[in-house]
Amino acid sequence: MKLSKYIDHTLLKPQATEKDILKLIEEAKTYDFASVCVNPSWVKLAYENLKDTDVKVCTVVGFPLGATSTASKVYETKVAIEDGADEIDMVISVGQLKSGNDEYVKEEIKKIVEASKNKLVKVIIETCLLTEEEKVKACTLSKEAGADYVKTSTGFSTGGAKPEDIKLMRETVGKDMGVKASGGIHTKEEMEAMIENGATRIGASCGVQLVR
C-alpha cells in the first residue's frame, strides 16, 4: 500500500475556518490520502467536496475528552453518518476505564458501532493517560465491542503516539483489527516507525510533508 493511503489528513483545531477545511480537502484529493478527519460541523462540507472521490470523510465523537454521556456520543454518531461521514473516531470514557467500569466502556463502544451503520469505527484510547495494563484492557474491550480500529491519541492531551504503544496495541488486538497512530507524527521516519510496529492508519495534520 502506498504511504498516502495510510494517512487520515487531519484538521481538528477549533479555530479552523471553512477556507482551512477546503484547503485540507484539496490536499487530500491531490495526494490521495485515505481520508480527511474534521470536526462534526464540517462533515457536510467535506462530504459535498469528496463524494466523487475515493477519499473518505472521517469525524470525531466525544472529542477530545471522551467524558460526554453515551447518549450524546450515540447522537453525535448518528448525525455524523447522516451528514456523510464514512468513519467515526470516538473517544472512550477514560475515567470509566480507569475506575474499572469495563462493562460501561464496552457497552458504549458497542452502541456507537451499532449507530454507525457499518461505517468504520476507531476507538481513541488516549494512551498517554493509561498504564500498560489499561492500554491492553482498552484495546481488548474495543475489539470485543466490534470496533474496527484502536487509536492512540486525540492529539489534545499530554502526549501522542509512540512506537512502543503501537507495538503493544497490535500485539493485543492481533492481525484482524486496525491500529491507528496519531498525535505528534511530523516526519516520514516517525510515520514509518509506526507502520513497522503495526500501525495501519496514521492520523496527521502535516500529511503533505509526510508524503513529499
Swiss-Prot record:
Pathway(s) this gene product operates in, as recorded in its UniProt entry: Carbohydrate degradation; 2-deoxy-D-ribose 1-phosphate degradation; D-glyceraldehyde 3-phosphate and acetaldehyde from 2-deoxy-alpha-D-ribose 1-phosphate: step 2/2
EC number: 4.1.2.4
Active site: 89, 151, 180
Record-level GO cellular component terms: cytoplasm
Enzyme class (EC, first level): lyase
Compartments reported by the entry: Cytoplasm
InterPro entries: Aldolase_TIM (IPR013785), DeoC (IPR011343), DeoC/FbaB/LacD_aldolase (IPR002915), DeoC_typeI (IPR028581)
Catalytic activity, as annotated: 2-deoxy-D-ribose 5-phosphate = D-glyceraldehyde 3-phosphate + acetaldehyde
UniProt KW keywords: Cytoplasm, Lyase, Schiff base
Swiss-Prot/TrEMBL GO biological process terms: 2-deoxyribose 1-phosphate catabolic process; carbohydrate catabolic process; deoxyribonucleotide catabolic process
Keyword Lyase: yes
Chief subcellular location: cytoplasm
Domain of life per record: Bacteria
A GO molecular function held by the record: deoxyribose-phosphate aldolase activity
Entry keyword annotation includes Cytoplasm: yes
Family that this chain belongs to: Belongs to the DeoC/FbaB aldolase family. DeoC type 1 subfamily.
Function recorded in the entry: Catalyzes a reversible aldol reaction between acetaldehyde and D-glyceraldehyde 3-phosphate to generate 2-deoxy-D-ribose 5-phosphate.
Protein name: Deoxyribose-phosphate aldolase
Phylogenetic classification of the source organism: Bacteria, Bacillati, Bacillota, Clostridia, Eubacteriales
